[in-house]
Amino acid sequence: HQHTGNWAGKTVANAVGTCEAHGCQLTLVDLPGTYSLRAHSAEEAVARDFLCLEQPDAVVFVCDVSCLARNLNLVLQGMELARRVLVCVNLLDEGEKKGISVDLPALEACLGVPVIGMSARSKQGLEELLERLCTQLQAESVPLPKVVAYDPDLERAVCKLLPPIQAQQPVGIRARWAALRMLEEDAALLQKLSDRQLLNLEAPDLQDAWEEARALLASSNAPPVADRMIAAIVTESRELAEEVVQEP
């Protein structure tokens, strides 16, 4: 048994446990609680680095029903990176006391990934979570999750980077996610990807495309790339929550 929590700052180190369910031997890693993968804090950096460098087989995002919009910021960022994603909407019992409910099937349809409602304290929903997790793990392939659409200039810059990234056939990281990290010039993360030989940033075709993408973005006279990404994700999260959450 591990004592963990799903609020930001609760877990300060990774807690690891194992269990067997539905024919799967699972190793579960509880990452530091965070609302973002932007690596502005130690918790965010640990969570982000684990997801992109350790490449888990699946990622379960545990959300609080009472602040779903804020939690969806993290979910949408994570879905750009991970290939197998499940979303757990927790504390349904507490939400019910406050008059809060979530249309779980609608949220699942919007995100394109399994969504499970839970009240972890009473273990309500735990069996469904394990069953759907194992189904994902045993499937040869799963549909890719929803992609956040950014502004047209940013999307054009991404399109310039995708062919040379895909030509490298990077293992364990998604080409679109790598392109976005290059566009926001996340030097520390890009160095880690290079050190792990997950992406060859010095490849001539990639360098040429990167320069073209930079020039395109510089000519648009828009806010910094990271700010544009965050704004799009926050807007998408808010609109999703407004669509599926009912509250007094």
Task: Describe these PLM feature segments.
Residues 1-42, 52-54, 58, 80:
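Conserved G1/Walker A P-loop phosphate-binding module
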Residues 8, 12, 24-27, 39, ...:
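Helical mechanochemical/support elements of P-loop NTPase systems and associated helical scaffolds
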Residues 17-23, 45-116:
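Conserved C-terminal guanine-recognition region of P-loop GTPase G domains, centered on the G4
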Residues 30, 90, 119:
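Active-site glycine-centered loops adjacent to acidic/histidine catalytic or metal-binding residues
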Residues 34, 65-68, 120-123:
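Short, surface-exposed acidic/glycine-rich loop or hinge patches that mediate macromolecular interfaces
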Residues 93-149:
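Canonical P-loop GTPase G-domain recognition
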Residues 112, 139-248:
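Extended helical scaffolds that flank P-loop GTPase cores
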